[in-house]
């Protein structure tokens, strides 16, 4: 198998799963009214050694209600913190030749 074909065995779903497993220990969803409805997606770029290339940032957020609006910004802050704490990410080296930019979904389910 040539090096170019090796990445074909590592799917995007596998990469997302590996990243989620590494984020989970660093993520605690904020508490409060309707906080379980919040979903925050953070975008970040990784160097070939798994370290962060730049600062993670908010990509999207959903589930914001009048009741959980006070927790929404905290949700983003905690998600960015989790990405920073999880770095450097441990992914197969060949992944970095095909994937540099990542997104991660933070919700109540990830903290369980």
Label each PLM-derived region with a short phrase.
Residues 1-18, 22-24, 28, 32:
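Intrinsic-disorder/low-complexity signature in envelope-associated proteins
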Residues 66-73:
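An anionic, turn-rich surface loop/hairpin at beta-sheet edges
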Residues 32-35, 94-96:
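Short beta-strand
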């Amino acid at each position: 198998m040539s090096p170019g074909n090796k990445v074909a065995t590592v799917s995007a779903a596998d990469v997302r799963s590996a990243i989620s497993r590494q984020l989970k220990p660093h993520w605690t969803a904020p508490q409060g009214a309707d906080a379980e409805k919040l979903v925050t997606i953070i975008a970040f770029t990784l160097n070939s050694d798994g370290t962060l290339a730049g600062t993670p940032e908010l990509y999207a957020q959903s589930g914001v209600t009048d009741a959980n609006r006070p927790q929404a910004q905290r949700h983003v802050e905690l998600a960015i913190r989790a990405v920073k704490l999880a770095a450097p990410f441990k992914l197969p080296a060949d992944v970095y030749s095909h994937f540099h930019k990542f997104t991660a979904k933070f919700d109540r389910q990830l903290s369980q």
